[in-house]
From Swiss-Prot:
The modification Phosphothreonine is found at residues 39, 119. It comes from Oryctolagus cuniculus. This is Fructose-bisphosphate aldolase B. Its EC number is 4.1.2.13. Keywords: Acetylation, Cytoplasm, Cytoskeleton, Glycolysis, Lyase, Phosphoprotein, Schiff base. In vertebrates, 3 forms of this ubiquitous glycolytic enzyme are found, aldolase A in muscle, aldolase B in liver and aldolase C in brain. The modification Phosphoserine is found at residues 36, 89, 132, 272, 276, 299, 301, 309. It is an enzyme of class 4 (lyase). GO terms for molecular function: fructose-1-phosphate aldolase activity; fructose-bisphosphate aldolase activity.
Amino acid sequence: MAHRFPALTPEQKKELSDIAQRIVANGKGILAADESVGTMGNRLQRIKVENTEENRRQFREILFTVDNSINQSIGGVILFHETLYQKDSQGKLFRNILKEKGIVVGIKLDQGGAPLAGTNKETTIQGLDGLSERCAQYKKDGVDFGKWRAVLRIADQCPSSLAIQENANTLARYASICQQNGLVPIVEPEVIPDGDHDLEHCQYVTEKVLAAVYKALNDHHVYLEGTLLKPNMVTAGHACTKKYTPEQVAMATVTALHRTVPAAVPGICFLSGGMSEEDATLNLNAINLCPLPKPWKLSFSYGRALQASALAAWGGKAENKKATQEAFMKRAVVNCQAAKGQYVHTGSSGAASTQSLFTASYTY
């Protein structure tokens, strides 16, 4: 059956495909710097820094003004609405600083969860109303990709088929709207690590979720070559007593992806899901060394796992700028190595990089 009503022109498809490929080229990944005001406040509270717009701006300025060689490791940065319009201390927009480094600018587009009545505290995601207009404005303001996070959890009767289908369709509708406005959609269906489930249970659920997501993307005529996937790695629940090796995590993760994600998708950028910085790197490296066919780029889209050591080094003090940038650069470089399967663990990581970053029922 011929598609009589094409969703995108060949020119639109090429632009989207080119953007997606740029973000994940040569082991590059994504810095997720799209924490909301409240989430950033929790991070600042841990280092005893007040949650003000100026303090948030100062920390992000330090990250974004790092040496230009960061563009060898970071292909894209996801911003929060506030950050997109912030400037450095010289009056230059953050987004322009990033673009001049050759880094693609993205934006968080979802507007948080809303309860699904009749379920065990499951949610759907808000933000479709007015999304097309927001995307059009962001495109004018220099944004080239978007991000939308759907949350599914493993618990009694969870995730329900209703939650899976509702979130899959919402992700697909968002992706379609993004592409109509020239933005590459990052599709993020996260099976969160809360709970005591084992690795096999997480793999089973992750496969069900991803299968539903790609069915919905197909139903909505989404151009897969112009998308990126941001999934959870397949891991046991945070409260599971059995511990698994990075190789076991890798095999379960790549198997789940192999069964559900079409080869047309150019890149899969994993979220870190509250892992320590070091575990997020070790698992990504093992995934890239997994002896299964991997038709996609397998990279990272980390927030906490790129920023924890940097935030600890900063401590809210301007004189710590150099140490903060060095800590951030180190995590970016090692994750780029891991995205190529070339990371060698030396065992000399600092305390901040080995500390678990798990937060129950985590929200951005």
